[in-house]
Amino acid sequence: MTRVAAHAPATEARLPEGDDKQRAVEAMFDRIAPRYDRLNRIISLGQDRRWRRHTVAALRLAPGATVLDLGCGTGDLCDVVAAAGYFATGVDFSAGMLAAAHTRAPLARADALSLPVPDASTDGVVSGFALRNFVDLDRFFRECARVLRPGGRLATLETAEPASPLLRAGHHIWFRRVVPFVGATLAKDAEAYEYLPRSTAYLPPSGDLLALVEAAGFAAVERRTFTAGAVQLITGTRR
């Protein structure tokens, strides 16, 4: 299995890896769960709803299709899946996030890298801003391929860095200065909202990310960006 390592600049604390990462991320999301949705709206300037609609629209499945939302958090993406006429099931490893969930979709506490789901049993898989929190991206995409039926669709939404140097500079100011300040002020958890921007270091370059998806068993792998390149949507079809 290929693990994607994070390399923090020397001036920053090194990001955790492996089991340490999983424990740290789970504990962090348990802490911030009660305020997570409110902070999402503020940090994204309300754009997160639009991004989720784009994610679900990219599935292009028949009405009544079954869709797993991996790293579902409080269920925002599950609700968009259901509104599109699909049957959503949410999966997350954070008990705190599941306890704070507002969705009517069924939810399960499980590890997205080892799902309690039969092979080729679902039509679609989505995730929203969860990739950087998984310990092993290669294993994650292979697990998505395992549970999807042939022809099933993957759509995963994640942060990105704008290509333009000017836009990238503005993005860094917002993500690395404003977001931690907002998190410390409103969520009373500076540590969590300093980690979240830095966690983008776990993501490989876009070309490598697409290659991981293809190697896991997906065809027609594509990448779209939104909001001046600050967000990316990766899609693919199970071979």
Q: What positions do the PLM features span?
A:
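A short glycine-rich, Lys/Arg-flanked "PGG" loop and its adjoining helix->strand segment in the class I
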Residues: 138-150
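N-terminal, positively charged/glycine-rich alpha-helical extensions of SAM-dependent methyltransferases
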Residues: 1-35, 175
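Core SAM-dependent methyltransferase catalytic element
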Residues: 219, 225-239
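A short acidic, Gly/Pro-enriched loop at the edge of an enzyme's catalytic core
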Residues: 113-124
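Hydrophobic beta-strand segment of the Class I
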Residues: 36, 125-126
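Conserved alpha-helix/loop element of class I SAM-dependent methyltransferases that forms part
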Residues: 35-38, 45-63
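C-terminal alpha-helical "lid/dimerization" subdomain adjacent to the S-adenosyl-L-methionine
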Residues: 23, 157, 161-212, 216, ...
